[in-house]
Amino acid sequence: MAGNAYSDEVLGTTNWLKEKSNQEVFSFVFKTEDVQLNGKDIGWNNYKKELQEDELKSLQRGAETTWDQSEDMEWESTVDEMTKKQVFIYDSLVKKCLFEVLSTKNIAPADVTWFVQHEWGKDQGWHCHVLIGGKDFSQAQGKWWRRQLNVYWSRWLVTACNVQLTPAERIKLREIAEDSEWVTLLTYKHKQTKKDYTKCVLFGNMIAYYFLTKKKISTSPPRDGGYFLSSDSGWKTNFLKEGERHLVSKLYTDDMRPETVETTVTTAQETKRGRIQTKKEVSIKTTLKELVHKRVTSPEDWMMMQPDSYIEMMAQPGGENLLKNTLEICTLTLARTKTAFDLILEKAETSKLTNFSLPDTRTCKIFAFHGWNYVKVCHAICCVLNRQGGKRNTVLFHGPASTGKSIIAQAIAQAVGNVGCYNAANVNFPFNDCTNKNLIWVEEAGNFGQQVNQFKAICSGQTIRIDQKGKGSKQIEPTPVIMTTNENITVVRIGCEERPEHTQPIRDRMLNIHLTHTLPGDFGLVDKNEWPMICAWLVKNGYQSTMASYCAKWGKVPDWSENWAEPKVPTPINSLGSARSPFTTPKSTPLSQNYAITPLASDLEDLALEPWSTPNTPVAGTAETQNTGEAGSKACQDGQLSPTWSEIEEDLRACFGAEPLKRDFSEPLNLD
């Protein structure tokens, strides 16, 4: 844009509006209405009484000057003098109202940005737009400003009314002006509360895009809509002619247009919301994201992991309900977006998988005590936790006491985190704690009795509605169940009567893990990191937590009578430089086999051993001899090197003893 192509007034106004482009201001409209009092008609042009105050006279002369300076000399205006005078009086009264409110707030006029424009509308007639704002203005003050301006506006209108009115009629006119809200404020209606709230506008944008684009009124009475005159706190638009105003609007629009148009994607939820979010809402949403990210599922976890946000919400009015509802949204989000298997797997430390030994875990040791294929059992459990078990949605650990049922179930529940517990003591609402959970834990289950149908629905992964204490019914989505018991839960008794028709349906819903081996007293608990590492090991080795993967690995889906011992797992050992694998063929030493090795004479000749020295090695069969033999074999295995002759001699002596060797070597060899 060439600097000499436009006048200084145009460029100055454009730059001034650009400086104020992001300033938020109130938007008011001053107006009048036709009133009839005792047969006396009062219209918009009946407020032309001579003003007595010096300040009002000065403001009126300023309006007259603005009109004269902003007229275009190329064409002659036909607006009559009475209409002009009425607009001048209105301009002085509007500014008088603004200055009086500023005075009550102790705000200096120099600290305020304002714009006034008198217009004529086809339907509304005369009205005056006012934009006002500053550093001492806030959105919450908008309605207070409207009430104060309405009071002053009605008072000064009564003073300027040139219709002969009695004192009672003047009071009535003022009441009508105040009650009818002859000063209005730009507001928006909240969709939820259905209340009106102040809507601030951007000062520069509103003037350039809306007010400066209008045409000037040139006829009397006005036939079309347009503006009479305008003024502002910076004395920028006061004396601009109509063409210059349109030019300022064009320059401002061109300068404020972004060079590159950024494409923004608005979600359906944002479009539906279509409102301004409060700081409280933003704070709650930020807190909720942090709670979900850190997997906070209980008030205790919140207190420990996010104490600042917990105290902040607790200190608010109704904080207890706010905490409860926020935590409920968090658990609902986890329950709908994650499975129990996902929550366990994300806790695994994958960097430790290299040295992780699956058979050394306490869970696999418990399964190995029963001769089971622990990889197969863990794979089946993970499929159920991943909601891939179909109708078989429950893992049942049952058997005598002290067989490891509860410690495995407890380790799985702790790894999941978002767990609901069945409360058998609460007869009427046993599932009160089981909504919005990733896992339901039933500890020491007994006779289901009257609740058997509800239990079967939950154990099969169906969506059902349950009653809650003090609340309405609530829906339980398909949720895996882990159950421990010492009893035969397939036998259902209602009163004194056994109901055998429930036995098979219950079995069809259970992954049956029957533990019978009593654990030693020093066995200990399952480590909290054990199940995350088990899940990560299964995924790494191709055991995906889906029923398709399970069938591909083990042949069929598990049933109630599943043989967990087949196929067998080879005895695992450590492979040098790698993790222990359950499918590595074990090496053996002579003592690990149940037979004796007798070397042939030709073999001894090939060995070319030196004559036997006095044997100091104990006779084979003693504990010391066995330990020595194992040590020699282990040294050979660990070294992975060719043995020396002395090591071979030492191993032979350790394995067979001195006397058996001499006797075998002295006997003649009979090849027949």
Curated annotation (Swiss-Prot):
Residues 373-528 form the SF3 helicase domain. It is found in: Host nucleus. ATP binds at residues 399-406. The keyword Manganese does not apply. This is Initiator protein NS1. Its cofactor is Mg(2+). Gene3D superfamilies: 3.40.1310.20, P-loop containing nucleotide triphosphate hydrolases (3.40.50.300). GO terms for cellular component: host cell nucleus. Belongs to the parvoviruses initiator protein NS1 family. It catalyses: ATP + H2O = ADP + phosphate + H(+).
